[in-house]
Amino acid sequence: DQYKSIGTNEFLYDSLRYYGEPSEKDVQNAQFILHLPPNPNDKVGERVDAQGIIKILAAMVEQENYTWEMKLDETMVANALVSGTTVRINSNAKLYETDAHALAHHELGVHLATSLNGRMQPLQILSLGCPVSTTTQEGMAILSEFLSGNLTLQRLKTLALRVIAVKSLIEDKNFRTTFLILKETYNVSDDLAYTITARVYRGGGYTKDYLYLRGFSAILSAYEHEKDFNNLLAGKTSLEFLPLITRLIDKGLLIAPHFITPAFKNPVQSDAVNTFITHAIR
């Protein structure tokens, strides 16, 4: 429904209705991350272009036996986007190798995997998803980056900057003002400030981006405390429904997830500094 109102004042209203807005706690978490010094242990590797990104994604697809259709798209703001089993990649994307591997674990390891698992379910909603599942889905995607060893402090800062940008949008700041807040207050490059601002202002005001950091915190806690955590991969669902999903799987009414996120199966030892930081987000 929201896409019907793109470019109108209704789009921001629908965005707030679906995704809400950052709480004071969300903003405090973002500020905490943004005031941290660089982590000298973060390794980023060489820069790769869209073809290099495709090579990294294709390797994971082959390894995990995913079904996908890959399309290059020069009109995208994001670096990649999964819709069903179609993976769109920004033809202008240039990422460090670590970020490209993080992208693979994010988009394929969670978004594509839950799409494929959801299509196997008798309940169609688990394939389609809905706005209420966004926090969980994006939280799991960031967790996948973290457990694969590819979540850098700079990536966390980018997620934190999205919170600040959404807050600025809601405070009725215009595009230019939000861009300058990111650039001048947080010393962000022109390219990154523009990309973050464009993501938030697209369509007329898209508040979804603040949910990545909130979702990651909630999902990290669930990963560490919920024994049936992987059942969240059964489709496009939300953390609050995990007990119900588990009961339905146990009764044979839903199918246990076939595709398990690689980083959930084989997590790597994370950098001690970033591990401390991620657990400090509350």
Identify the residue ranges that each predicted region occupies.
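Contiguous, non-catalytic segments that form substrate-binding/exosite surfaces or channel walls
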Residues: 1-95
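Conserved structured core elements
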Residues: 51, 102, 135-138, 172, ...
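Active-site-adjacent bridging/hinge elements
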Residues: 81-86, 111-117, 189-193
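Post-HEXXH active-site segment of zinc metalloproteases
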Residues: 98, 113-137
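Short alpha-helix carrying the canonical HExxH Zn2+-binding catalytic motif
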Residues: 99-113
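Hydrophobic/aromatic-lined pockets within catalytic cores
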Residues: 109, 113, 117-118, 145-149, ...
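Post-HExxH zinc-binding segment in Zn-dependent metallohydrolases
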Residues: 127-167, 215
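Conserved alpha-helical "signature site"
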Residues: 155-282
